[in-house]
Swiss-Prot record:
Plays an essential role in transcription initiation and cap-stealing mechanism, in which cellular capped pre-mRNAs are used to generate primers for viral transcription. Binds the cap of the target pre-RNA which is subsequently cleaved after 10-13 nucleotides by PA. Plays a role in the initiation of the viral genome replication and modulates the activity of the ribonucleoprotein (RNP) complex. In addition, participates in the inhibition of type I interferon induction through interaction with the host mitochondrial antiviral signaling protein MAVS. One of its GO terms (cellular component) is host cell nucleus. GO terms for molecular function: RNA binding. Signal peptide: none annotated. It is found in: Virion; Host nucleus; Host mitochondrion. This is Polymerase basic protein 2. Gene3D superfamilies: Polymerase Basic Protein 2, C-terminal domain. It comes from Influenza A virus (strain A/Chicken/Hong Kong/YU562/2001 H5N1 genotype B).
Amino acid sequence: SVKKEEEVLTGNLQTLKIRVHEGYEEFTMVGRRATAILRKATRRLIQLIVSGRDEQSIAEAIIVAMVFSQEDCMIKAVRGDLNFVNRANQRLNPMHQLLRHFQKDAKVLFQNWGIEPIDNVMGMVGILPDMTPSTEMSLRGVRVSKMGVDEYSSTERVIVSIDRFLRVRDQRGNVLLSPEEVSETQGTEKLTITYSSSMMWEINGPESVLVNTYQWIIRNWETVKIQWSQDPTMLYNKMEFEPFQSLVPKAARGQYSGFVRTLFQQMRDVLGTFDTVQIIKLLPFAAAPPEQSRMQFSSLTVNVRGSGMRILVRGNSPVFNYNKATKRLTVLGKDAGALTEDPDEGTAGVESAVLRGFLILGKEDRRYGPALSINELINLAKGEKANVLIGQGDVVLVMKRKRDSS
């Protein structure tokens, strides 16, 4: 479709520059709990047929479609200023701004959208602005299908791939969509994929953010671990931890972060307290700007499933459960992956075989002499420390364990 820039005014008289998609298009949106077919013209939603597991999933799909329609009544439904930023303090693009705004509160959007009388069609019902079903009236252009949406789709499904810059390509390599030109959501909602970009985790709601964040840490544990011990600030600023912040109660973010960072610093300083599972569990909380306070916590709250659930600082909970026997992590009952190492040891992967029996204490410390190769470690006595070269030229300080690990 052709795209051209247009300036539009929100309900708060803020000017937004959006790239308008001109012409008729049809999209299949596939989320985790809802699917939909959207037919739209230039800045106009023609028809949306949505099917989902529950009221909230249906509402989320409707919001995405309404925002993507770029209709004026959606833009005029904005109350207050749009100033969502990512953690690097860059403003999100206008379409994303709108999406975030209405994901927080869509009441005005639904109220202003307009309703229409509907015909009685088998398997279809209307949906009112308060998200209750109706057989007489429905939000303009919107219908809920009880059976799923496949049979209403006239488009062929295409197999696409997404690269890490969120460019969507077909099998011939043509770019169909990219963030440069469209709200990220639309480009991905229509695809059944696990999002490779953390910007996408939020679209499927809080649970998806939680699971994806921990999956990401586990998948990248090798590099995360080295950064954790050598350059934690860089690690805390990673954009992958950004979506997670929306789950942490606003008032607690800074306190949690300060608490976790202090705890981590103690782990780096105090011998023998490196605890892989605990680091993985608490790491996302350290990403918020920390507040210095003497607050101690035994559990941290995250808002998922409509209420606060607790992650225990020490030990398992329904939100975060590590099974020592299987070495697998489950987050909210979903498998988030396996830890390839014995969490008792401070290391994994290539070095784990050789560094079994050693603790990684943190950054290189020149007082303990030049860096040894892994093979030279054999000569250390129990409790003795040394710098050792691991991985890609990284030097860390290790200590030979005083006890033999079981």
